[in-house]
From Swiss-Prot:
Biased composition (Basic residues): 95-113
Family membership noted in the UniProt record: Belongs to the eIF-3 subunit D family.
Gene: eIF3d2
GO cellular component: eukaryotic 43S preinitiation complex; eukaryotic 48S preinitiation complex; eukaryotic translation initiation factor 3 complex
Recorded GO MF terms: mRNA cap binding; translation initiation factor activity
Name the UniProt record assigns to this protein: Eukaryotic translation initiation factor 3 subunit D-2
One of the GO BP terms on file: formation of cytoplasmic translation initiation complex
Domain notes: The RNA gate region regulates mRNA cap recognition to prevent promiscuous mRNA-binding before assembly of eif3d into the full eukaryotic translation initiation factor 3 (eIF-3) complex.
InterPro entries named among the record's database cross-references: eIF3d
Ranges of compositional bias, category Basic and acidic residues: 133-145
Keywords: Cytoplasm, Initiation factor, Protein biosynthesis, RNA-binding
Gly residues bias locations: 114-127
Disulfide links within the chain: none
Region Disordered, annotated ranges: 94-148
Length: 545
């Protein structure tokens, strides 16, 4: 027994006061740092080949990446070393194929897809930029700026000016925002009945239907005169106001009010209430008759005043184009004309007037509201069965496709005219909606649209006709999502508000910077001169009789 080693009983740690660890810690046991978010899948990695190069460190422990796990020795700093962890990326869950994007046309991935080409481009001094990603000037594209300009995220806010200066003595009556107006509806409004028809119309020249980009035709200037009479200046409306109706307006004014929810620019309409009658009129020397250009575009014209691409210059250009186009496409001269029942009241001997026919129509809007409106046609067309079809002729104009961020007509109009029309519906939604409402109110059988472009982007005086297109107004209103029930509801709502007010003059104005309309009570002489005072006296005389 003396030759054997003695048996020494081991010392067992025993906690007599609880179930936890002993009070005396084992300071000599090595400690392995860990993080509870680490993956515990290392034991199965040997079953798959090591092909994950992009996420090679997906199982690496992320312990110590944050400063909260850092160890600082305060007593002995001789063995302390700083470890640079700036190059280590935080742990991200591995997801195969996420955010892969379009690799078919990407020159950076052609080397991996087997489509040819290198993995990295060789454009200038910037490695890794493909040839297709660079412009012709050798500068790489800034995709973030492109996206910002495209969707208007970084576009500067521009405060638009009001169509009329609001004075301090004007009383605000009502403010209606567009969401409320869009909920209005007045269904089952019957077709308007003709009360008086006057004027003469020329026949449409069908050769303009065969015009295309390769067979363009220059736009000619016309010297024919057109009278733009307001509601109270129209002698026929003055005559009708004695007997029938209590609401009087023109188709341009009605279309502006009915399509107000699509407008961005400011405009105003005057309501003259005398007794139980209301005259919807426009101010003299106002820009009400000018056609807007790219009003609803993401990037409307922002050029300085005096430039050919300023909003006012483009509006003047578009108005002249429409005036010349609607007369050029007609067979003038000594050709046969379509005559209405009465001649035009302002016809003078030796004066060449434009081809235009007026229909004074009557609508019953309910609640004893009878609307009398002057509508117009621009021409007539011989139908396939010999019937006469009335036309509303309008023209869209192209001024600079690059500046307006739209399609170039000379390249897309013949092959993709639907895409061109969709672009115009996006940039000129309000103008096209007004034209459609005017065509529906007048009862036109067709809406003729012409595509007129500048000869040069820097020349706003010479234009060419590239194409014509025709639509049925009712079908076209459905295509552009224009609800006539909502349009009638907006008009009826504003009429009811003015009907409840005392006699006087009221101004309906579109807010220049907010989607709402405002109704003001203005003085009688707010917009009138001495001649207009005489006109107001004549109107009161007519109503008294």
């Amino acid at each position: 027994m003396s030759g054997r080693a003695p048996f020494i009983k081991p010392v067992l740690e025993y906690n007599e006061h609880g179930w936890g660890p002993c009070e005396e810690l084992s300071v000599d046991v090595p400690y392995q740092p860990f993080c509870k978010s680490d993956r515990v899948g290392k034991i199965s990695d040997w079953t798959a080949p090591p092909t994950e190069r992009k996420f090679a460190n997906k199982y690496v422990s992320s312990f110590g990446n944050s400063n909260q796990y850092a160890y600082f020795h305060e007593d002995d700093e001789s063995t302390f070393h700083l470890v640079d962890t700036s190059g280590f990326k935080g742990f991200r869950p591995f997801q195969r194929g996420r955010f892969r994007g379009n690799t078919r046309n990407n020159p950076r991935t052609r080397g991996r897809t087997g489509r040819g080409g290198a993995v990295t481009g060789t454009g200038g001094n910037q490695p890794g930029v493909g040839v297709n990603e660079r412009t012709k000037y050798g500068k790489g594209r800034d995709n973030r700026r492109q996206m910002g300009r495209r969707f208007g995220r970084n576009a500067p806010t521009r405060m638009r000016e009001s169509s009329v200066v609001v004075r301090s003595d004007w009383v605000s009556i009502e403010e209606i925002d567009f969401p409320r107006l869009l909920k209005l509806s007045l269904p089952n409004v019957k077709e308007g009945q003709d009360v008086v028809t006057c004027g003469s119309l020329e026949y449409y020249d069908k050769t303009y239907d065969r015009i295309n980009v390769k067979n363009e035709r220059p736009l000619l200037k016309t010297d024919r005169i057109i009278h733009t009479l307001t509601t109270t200046d129209d002698p026929v409306i003055r005559r009708l106001s004695k007997t029938i109706g209590n609401i009087f307006a023109t188709d341009e004014i009605l279309a502006t009010i009915m399509c107000c929810t699509r407008s961005n620019y400011s405009w105003d309409v005057v309501f003259d209430k005398v007794g139980n009658k209301i005259f919807l009129d426009k101010r003299d020397n106002a820009q009400f008759d000018l056609l807007t250009v790219n009003e609803t575009a993401l990037e409307p014209p922002l050029e300085e005043e005096g430039s050919i691409n300023s909003p006012h210059s483009l509006a003047m250009e578009a108005t002249l184009i429409n005036h010349n186009f609607c007369q050029q496409v007609l067979r003038g001269g000594d050709q046969k004309k379509y005559q209405f029942e009465e001649p035009y009241t302002l016809e003078e001997s030796g004066v060449d007037l434009v081809s235009i026919g007026y229909r004074y129509k009557q609508w019953d809007l309910g609640n004893n509201i009878i609307l009398i409106a002057r509508c117009k046609h621009n021409g007539v067309l011989q139908g396939p069965n010999g019937e006469v079809q009335f036309l509303s002729i309008r023209a869209l104009n192209e001024w600079d496709s690059k500046a307006s961020n739209s399609l170039e007509w000379r390249q897309k109009l013949d092959t993709q005219h639907g895409a061109v029309l969709a672009s115009e519906l996006r940039n000129n939604a309000c103008k096209l909606a007004r034209w459609t409402v005017e065509s529906v109110l007048s009862g036109s059988d067709q809406l003729k649209l012409g595509y007129v472009s500048r000869v040069s982007t820097r020349d706003h005086l010479r234009h060419v006709i590239l194409r014509t297109q025709q639509f049925k107004p009712q079908e076209f209103s459905t295509q552009i999502n224009l609800s006539m029930d909502n349009a009638w509801g907006i008009l009826r709502c504003l009429i009811d508000i003015v009907m409840k007010q005392p006699d006087g003059k009221y101004l309906l104005m579109k807010d220049p910077n907010k989607p709402m309309v405002r109704l003001y009570d203005v003085p009688e002489n707010a917009f009138e001169s001495s001649d207009e005072d005489d006109l107001s006296d004549d109107k009161l005389f007519l109503l008294s009789n």
